[in-house]
Amino acid sequence: LAWLIVIKRYFGCIAGLVMWAGCRINSGLGLDPSGPSVSELMRCFEVVGLKNFLKGDFGEWDGSFSPKYIFRSHIILISAFEQIVGDVKYHVVMVAIAESASNRIHIFGVLVYRVTNGMPSGFWMTSVINTIGHDQMSYDNWSELTAHLPGDVWQPAVKDEHVVENFTGDDNGGVVDDDYKHIYNDITISEVFSKYGMNYTPPEKQGVQAIGVCSLEDFVYLKSNFVRDDRFGDCWRMALKDEVLREMLNWVTDSGDPWDLLMMTIDDSMRGMFAHGRVRFDDHKNAINRVLRSIGKPPLTHDYDVLLRDFYRKHGKNIA
């Protein structure tokens, strides 16, 4: 606990900046499914075209995430912190924290002990470190996959011209242009990861085409599809998969008032279904209302048009 408090003390403010910066630094942390950050993400993807999508999925990330990337992620945060505040007086302490978080073997006086690898599960800082580390891994993968090409193609700046990726912990989604889709895709990426013991879900299990990329319709990131708004082409909806929204209704918790918690979950489910359009929203609402009426409870009053106006308001659109 003390160690977590120390990390928050020295890294908390800069970690918040990572969440604020969003797709500008390839981060999906803090992405608001109903807000303009989704449209901003899709505009980042549009830079190289909404055609050849990447959608990775890791298994056993925590057990195979290299300490090298944990340390590098901390160092990146330290560098950003010192540039922003213009002070290096905490440098030694912050590097010591980074080394402690990155290494399994610790020495204290005459004691030598081993700690669990990686950041603690459930700690908010873990997502920040994993996100930055995942981003760094992608550039290393690019360098390895393009090393045989002439010139400086292997450099990170060249990757940024042809590939746009976004990371949220161990989740990633992205796009690659036609020039490099045969070199940098889910199949070739998984082959590189496998060399280093990273369990990257085989693309064939995700419905990815043989060349290792997929269409916008098949693209899934953070368990969601992305749908362009019918009225305003620069607005995008983040549609959490149907099965996830329906599964939410079966969640069970042993804390608080069960009915209040269920209604909160139903509200989240309805707001999530909004992204799927009016017809599926109404079908979902009607199905829930049938159950509520059967047990003598009042029906839902969620209104698609109200949610639509709120969606447009968040995007700065004025509608009658």
Label each PLM-derived region with a short phrase.
Residues 1-16, 99, 132-140, 264-276:
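Short, hydrophobic/amphipathic alpha-helical patches that form generic packing surfaces
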Residues 3-63, 139-158:
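Active-site-proximal segment of RNA-dependent polymerases
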Residues 11, 15, 42, 59, ...:
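Short, well-ordered alpha-helical packing segments
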Residues 27-35, 84-97, 152-155, 197-212:
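A generic structural motif
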Residues 32-37, 158-164, 172-174, 209-210:
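Beta-rich nucleic-acid/ligand-interaction surfaces
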Residues 49-167, 174-183, 218:
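Conserved polymerase palm-domain catalytic core
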Residues 113, 124, 180-320:
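Active-site and adjacent loop segments of nucleotide-processing enzymes
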